[in-house]
Curated annotation (Swiss-Prot):
Glycans are attached at residues 79, 387. This is Flocculation protein FLO11. The Flo11 domain contains aromatic residues that form two hydrophobic bands on the surface of the protein that confer homophilic binding. The hydrophobic bands are lined by stretches of acidic residues that may sensitise the protein to environmental pH. It comes from the Eukaryota. Disulfide bonds join 28-188, 37-167, 129-192, 143-152. Transmembrane segments: none annotated. It holds the Pfam family Flocculin_t3. Residues 198-317, 506-592 have a biased composition (Acidic residues). Belongs to the flocculin family. Highly divergent. It comes from Komagataella phaffii (strain GS115 / ATCC 20864).
């Protein structure tokens, strides 16, 4: 009987699924794929383009595969850095790369003309006859990040731009986007309004089997045994208790006497609430299903077959739904802690032509599956509210649509009162992280339009930023570990649970007890919680004891003992509140909770070196430089999943000893050398692996200690300074932009330095001359003669010492000049002036 019911049920389900999804994969006629609005390429600063949808194929529900055709003026393929479709409302993600040097995606061979296939969500038209795509964008980047720059200087268009495709920004019946999105018949059916009715009919046949159950239940009340169990109609009011026995092994109850058929029929009254769903369509009970039951002579078989639909999917779904709420009741609608909502990557506002902004996600609440409600916080430099034309969030991957308008003069939406600072709530799809512990938003954009379409123009002329711009939010365009988007998207723990890897084990644990301990669930608090919704259950909570005292104790003795010899004692354990002992007795589950902890391993590599590109930004410009740094990789294996964590860290200083080198630094301005400096610094050679090849890189670093001369260990023994002598030098003397050549007499002395090692160094030094007069008187009987001599003296020596000990009659000062200087105070002053000029 079990196998026959299984075959019967599977045939019913297969037929229902075939009828429900038989038209899946249908392709719409090309002639019926048309623009959803009229759009003209209003942006004249972008290359001319022709972007359209040329085909659509229905997948399931509101999901379609569409063919996108792209034609535009372009450079060569070697100049292309990246080309991608962003802001998609798609089950496969919000971005599709068609060409990327950074990500190594090369799906096209001609950037001027190409096609690609996209899987997208759609929204229904007002008459429910057509479906329409959500808005999206196509982003193009040229001549950057390793792409060839040949021909880029002659390219008259921007190096980076986005084509906007959509019908969500209408003005005077025309979309302000570059191109429109497209629409086509719903499910690619040309009969508008017919398919929905036919789509409901296959659902009713799937439920038409259930009206057979009420008909069979109506027949069974005709049996005298069913009315004897008058309390069971109250039990049908609580569908869960009987259903769980049905999902338990009551198929073995039919193996007992025919009385189990009565509970099986009494269980059909349990499904009599499910016929309430078909009772919405009472036509089917009036259909030819009732005659079919009289044609079937064996009513017990029909209840058994009617049980099978009850246990086919719907009772199992309640049981599974009762199982799922047990773990989901705890996280149902939980809000993630604010501290655990963090950026999914590092992004710097690289675009300096837009107003400075701070856009982030400040909160997340789990709704269901991969759907979350998030709070977006926006702060940016702005004009007044009266100048705002439109402000909206576009490119969302959301069940409510790809665009949310927060302010629009055209659409009459005024949800904010301060364009410089506001918050809003978004319902979005998310994608799981590699370790399945976190979820992350898909990329999106925030579009701002000022001073147009009826907005005030006061102050617009003084606005230094563009009148229309888009903030890009995402982590899908990484370069050197930094996102090239304006701001990052955010991530948070999956289902807002802080126990990564534990929740799946707890979700598995309830499944294990539910399969083995379903009898406990009737006795446990789950069903009493469900009965609490109906006041009859407290009465029926005692009625299960009455059946235990009635003839049905034989059924537990016959059905439960073979199935639940282990659990037959456990119902007594819950009565004795020994549920804590169940985990103690079933050590397998704690074992399963401990097992994920045992295989967790961590392996950390030594510090190696790598090159990073660091971007330093000032007020309006940014510069990039290569920096050598350390990198470590930690491999973590948990539950069989391996995660590699890369950490950049400073290089250990104790392993590097800089070598002093002389460096010439030249500062340029206006293509001319303005200053050249020679200084000593440290140099370190590093072997760096870049792109798989090893390269020796010299990195300049400050010296940890002062540069020590080679004679640092050699002590000076003696210093001998020679007597000053005179010499003549030639200098250019300039005054008031007029230069002339002058001959200057100056002093020169030599210092002979002898070191303890025996080395000798002679250092010549030019010194100015200082005039000193010394009168030597010679006493004689016949004549007194006075002699005046000009003595060259090193600056800094006292005049008295020069007068007494530095008289050198043998030294002559440049013939023809000394005599004049000796006798003329004016000439001496001139000599001092030249000496000063020389200094």
């Amino acid at each position: 009987m079990v196998s026959l019911r299984s075959i019967f049920t599977s045939s019913i389900l297969a037929a229902g699924l075939t009828r429900a999804h038989g038209s899946s994969g249908k392709t719409c006629p090309t002639s019926e794929v048309s623009p959803a609005c009229y759009a003209n390429q209003w942006e004249t600063t972008f290359p001319p383009s022709d972007i359209k949808i040329t085909g659509a194929t229905w997948v399931q529900d509101n999901i379609y595969d569409v063919t996108l055709s792209y034609e535009a003026e372009s450079l060569e393929l070697e100049n292309l850095t990246e080309l991608k479709i962003i802001g998609l409302n798609s089950p496969t993600g919000g971005t599709k790369l068609v060409w990327s040097l950074n990500s190594k995606v090369y799906d096209i061979d001609n950037p001027a003309k190409w096609t690609t296939t996209l899987r997208v969500y759609t929204k229904s038209s007002a008459d429910d006859c057509y479906v329409e795509m959500y808005p999206f964008q196509i982003q193009v980047d040229w001549c950057e990040a390793g792409a060839s720059t040949d021909g880029c200087s002659a390219w008259k268009w921007p190096k980076s731009y986005d084509y906007d495709i959509g019908c969500d920004n209408m003005q005077d019946g025309v979309s302000r986007k570059h191109h429109p999105v497209y629409k086509w018949p719903k499910k690619c059916s040309s009969d508008c309004g017919v398919e929905p009715t036919t789509s409901d009919e296959p659902e009713e046949p799937t439920t038409s089997e259930e009206p057979v159950e009420p008909t069979s239940s109506d027949e069974e009340p005709t049996t005298s045994e069913e009315p004897t169990t008058s309390e069971e109609p109250e039990e049908p009011t609580t569908s869960d208790e009987p259903e769980e026995p049905t999902t338990s092994e009551e198929p073995e109850e039919p193996t007992t006497s025919e009385e189990p058929e009565e509970p099986t029929t009494s269980e059909e009254p349990t499904t009599s609430e499910e016929p309430e769903e078909p009772t919405s369509s009472d036509e089917e009970p009036t259909t030819s299903d009732e005659p079919e039951e009289p044609t079937t002579s064996d009513e017990p078989e029909e209840p058994t077959t009617s049980e099978e639909p009850t246990t086919s999917e719907e009772p199992e779904e309640p049981t599974t739904s009762s199982e799922e709420p047990t773990p989901s009741e705890e996280p149902e609608g939980p809000t993630c802690p604010t501290s655990e909502v963090s950026p999914a990557c590092y992004a710097d506002q690289w675009e300096t032509t837009f107003p400075p902004s701070d856009i982030k996600i400040t909160g997340a609440t789990w709704v269901e599956d991969n759907i979350y409600d998030v709070t977006l916080s926006y702060e940016a430099e702005s004009l007044e509210l009266e100048n705002l034309t439109e402000l909206k969030i576009i490119g969302l991957n959301s069940p409510t649509g790809g665009t949310k308008v927060v302010w629009s003069l055209n659409s009459g939406i005024y949800d904010i009162d301060n364009p410089a600072k506001w918050t809003t709530t978004l319902r979005v799809y998310t994608k799981s992280s590699a370790d399945d512990c976190y979820v992350e938003m898909y990329p999106f954009q925030i579009q701002v339009d000022w001073c147009e379409a009826g907005a005030s123009t006061d102050g617009c002329s003084a606005w230094k930023w563009p009148k229309s711009y888009d903030y890009d939010i995402g982590c899908d365009n990484m370069q050197d570990g930094v996102s090239r988007k304006h701001h990052p998207v955010y991530k948070w723990p999956k289902k807002c649970s802080s126990n990564c890897g534990v929740e799946p084990t707890t979700s598995d644990e309830p499944e294990e007890p539910t399969t083995s301990e379903e009898p406990e669930e009737p006795t446990t608090s789950e069903e009493p919680e469900e009965p609490t919704s109906s006041d009859e259950e407290p009465t029926t909570s005692e009625e299960p004891e009455e059946p235990t005292t009635s003839d049905e104790p034989e059924e537990p003795t016959t059905s439960e003992e073979p199935e639940e010899p282990t659990t037959s004692e456990e119902p007594e354990e819950p009565t004795t509140s020994e549920e804590p002992e169940e985990p103690t007795t079933s050590d397998e589950e704690p074992g399963t909770t401990e097992e994920p902890l045992v295989p967790t391993t961590k392996t950390e590599t030594d510090v190696s070196t790598t090159l990073l590109t660091v971007t330093d930004c000032g007020t309006k410009t940014c510069t990039k430089s290569l920096v050598i740094t350390g990198v470590t990789k930690e491999t973590v294996t948990t539950h069989g999943k391996t995660t590699v964590i890369t950490t950049y860290c400073p290089l250990p200083t104790e392993t590097v000893t800089p070598t002093p080198v002389t460096v010439t630094s030249t500062i340029y301005a206006d293509e001319s050398v303005t200053k050249t400096t020679v200084y000593t610094t440290g140099a370190v050679e590093k072997t760096v692996t870049v792109g798989g090849s090893s390269t020796v890189v010299v990195v300049h670093t400050p010296l940890t200690t002062a540069v020590v001369q080679s004679q640092s260990t050699d002590e000076i023994k003696t210093v001998v300074t020679a007597r000053p002598s005179t010499t003549t030098i030639v200098r250019d003397v300039c005054y008031n932009s007029v230069c002339s050549v002058a001959t200057i007499v100056t002093g020169v002395t030599e210092k002979t330095i002898t070191f303890s090692t025996g080395s000798i160094t002679v250092v010549p030094t030019y010194v100015p001359l200082v005039e000193s007069e010394e009168h030597q008187r010679t006493a004689s009987t016949s004549e007194t003669r006075a002699t005046s001599v000009v003595v060259p003296t090193v600056v800094g020596q006292s005049s008295s010492a020069s007068a007494t000990s530095s008289i050198f009659p043998s030294v002559t000062i440049h013939e023809g000049v000394a005599n004049t200087v000796k006798n003329s105070m004016i000439s001496g002053a001139v000599a001092l002036l030249f000496n000063a000029l020389f200094l």
